[in-house]
Amino acid sequence: MASRQPAAKKPPAKKAAVPTKAPAKKAPAKKAAVRKAPARKVAAKKPAPKPAPNPTGGVYKLARALWLGVAHAVGAMFRGIGQGAKGLDPAHRKDGLALLLLGLALIVAAGTWSNLRGPVGDLVEMLVTGAFGRLDLLVPILLAVIAVRFIRHPEKPEANGRIVIGLSALVIGVLGQVHIACGAPARSDGMQAIRDAGGLIGWSAATPLTYTMGDVLAVPLLVLLTVFGLLVVTATPVNAIPQRLRLLGVRLGVVHDAQEGLAEDDERYDEQWREALPPNARRRGPAPAGYDPDGDEQEALSKRRSRPRRSAGQQPDLNRPMDAVDVAAAAAAALDGAVLHGMPPSPLVADLTQGVTVERDGYEETTPVPAARAKAVKPPRKEASKAGVPDLTKAPPAETRDLPARAEQLQLSGDITYSLPSLDLLERGGPGKTRSAANDAVVASLSNVFMEFKVDAAVTGFTRGPTVTRYEVELGPAVKVERITALTKNIAYAVASPDVRIISPIPGKSAVGIEIPNTDREMVNLGDVLRLADAAEDDHPMLVALGKDVEGGYVMANLAKMPHLLVAGATGSGKSSCINCLITSVMVRATPEDVRMVLVDPKRVELTAYEGIPHLITPIITNPKRAAEALQWVVREMDLRYDDLAAFGYRHIDDFNEAIRNGKVKLPEGSERELSPYPYLLVIVDELADLMMVAPRDVEDAIVRITQLARAAGIHLVLATQRPSVDVVTGLIKANVPSRLAFATSSLADSRVILDQPGAEKLIGKGDGLFLPMGANKPTRMQGAFVTEDEVEAVVQHCKDQMAPVFRDDVTVGTKQKKEIDEDIGDDLDLLCQAAELVVSTQFGSTSMLQRKLRVGFAKAGRLMDLMESRNIVGPSEGSKARDVLVKADELDGVLAVIRGEAAP
């Protein structure tokens, strides 16, 4: 009703024109207003006239469609050719460029050396002769030389930029001088005059100089530019010009070779070399048949003379990569006399040692080393050249080469000379594979899995190891890593392998790693690892070979830096092979004066092959009780070493030994002690579980003390077990053994005990392991090295032939007189001894007295009284009265010895 009020009031405004019956016509007036709006719209908008049909429009559209179709077809054809060109081998591309340059050289030679007719000849004359002038005859020779270089050295593209810059400077300088020598014709003299001089290049180089400076300064500047180009092309620095000229003169026969004048110096050097030998150095045992000492000496001298020697003022060749000698010199200068072993090098030295290749033939000269401080010398070796890498694989490690036999021997006490075993005693493995058809099939399977589950990810590469291959997967934008880890079972199903391990992410890379076992596994030989360049350059006696990682690189570790190692794995996982590799590595690299060993083998069959080697400080221990006593001796030895370090003011055994060798350690006056360097002491326990079952308290206490304190004393511990449970590898042992090596385990719980993280339960056994060194966040997957029984026997026999073992008698002393402490005493041994001493000395057996004197509670005092009653020290209880004391005061020492488990005095 309220909405109709305005409509009812509008008609009265029109009542002046309509005097009567206006209210009755209100409804028709509204209808008329509604009808007028459509009439106005029809009148306002009229349809536009349609254009007349164009007869040429269809033809135009047809022609346009045909043109676009042809253009797309031609573009697709050329794009296909371009994609095919991208797939060509890089060597074919370089050969194609070289052949193109040869063809161009032939065309230019035909146009410049002969009167070639036709448009090609005119083009050559216009371009080549017009640009190079009188020297156009040398252009085809220059092109041919460049083409031959591309053919002979296709693997050195990094020098192309240098050669282009040098040739440009050389050509510009020479043509500028030719232009000035021919009178410096200008453009007004005509193009023919410029062609008869240095061409357009010579005119462009010489005209600005002659215009601004004149000929007097222009010619020297162009000569300097020419010399600069020549030095750049030949890669010769200015300070090496005399050396290069001397070498060129020697090759041409113009200059006398300075090396021939050193013959007299060789003879004098030979005398010094003979005098440097130890006077008492001789072979142990009878000499082999056919051995001629004088002949061998002359042969060695002739070989030494045949090595290239530098004169005093001769500088090293600057047109070669740095070799190991240069790196060592730079490292020594950077460290300024610091001890390299036992501390990490500076970042400068670390960067300096990266990417070093040795390209020298022969050996470098070394200064004779006194026999008392001689070490096994590792001569330099060649690194194998790296072959071409397939599409998805990473660069394989350099292959190992033969190392020359060690010629230097380490002098021991007296007249004994100990020679290290040769690496020829260890077998050599075959070259490792970098790619196989199985890897390509796995890449295709992974790509199909990602496509089926609509995951934006792609396999960008893989690195093949001896046991597993790690495939690198890069994720697309906004793709969660959890989408890859959730597909673990699907990936295992696709590649038909249950042992799939996913690493998210790969350390140091923005990629997810998928480790899948190889169907064609490879064996890693111990000899291949020890022949590695790093092993040859590092003479530390505690460097041991472990195996080969998933990226194809060899894994070695220094036991002195670990400083203790826990090795664990189920039966058949490769634990025993790892222990054999550790012991064999030490025997091959260290003498008995460098490293002594204590071997504990409760199983009695694993380490018996090493019985009798001179590195042993005691016979192999098979009795668990004697093993506990040996560990106690190691603790005492550690304390004695620390006493010496504290007395003479040294913090590490290496510094103490170095001071002894240099004669810096002085004994007090009147002391009859003879100081000698302490060897490293390596304790290897093959089965920790057996020791923990027999004497858990003594073994754990000794191991904890050794692992906590023995690093600076040069004592290192290797613990191995096939039952890595919490009652064997306790929390105290784990906390003090930072380096772990886990082989295949039977459960996730065992993996967490060893590594504190999962992963070992997914290993496939037979040497497949996870190595977690001290300070690393994630373990490295590796294939453990393998050494055969024949190899071990050969190395052991060589060591036995050198010298007999010298055992110490105090390692397991007292095991027959000493007995175990009674279990009912527990941790109350000290309190029980104090209580017995108090009761016997006072002859008064009262529980309340024990409470007051020992400050213990009633329960503890009553327990001590019961323990003394069971050992016949006091009599039975008589109510509130004091107990009778059954032991006299003069028998107290014997009672205390029995309580402590010692023999009665």
From Swiss-Prot:
UniProt binding sites for ATP:
572-577
Domain of life of the organism encoding this protein: Bacteria
Q: Does the keyword Cell cycle apply?
A: yes
* Membrane side Cytoplasmic: residue ranges: 237-905
The answer to whether UniProt assigns keyword Transmembrane helix to this entry is yes
Q: What is the membrane topology here? A: Multi-pass membrane protein
PANTHER family in the record, alphabetically? DNA TRANSLOCASE FTSK (PTHR22683:SF41), SPORULATION PROTEIN RELATED (PTHR22683)
Q: What is this protein called?
A: DNA translocase FtsK
Gene behind the chain: ftsK
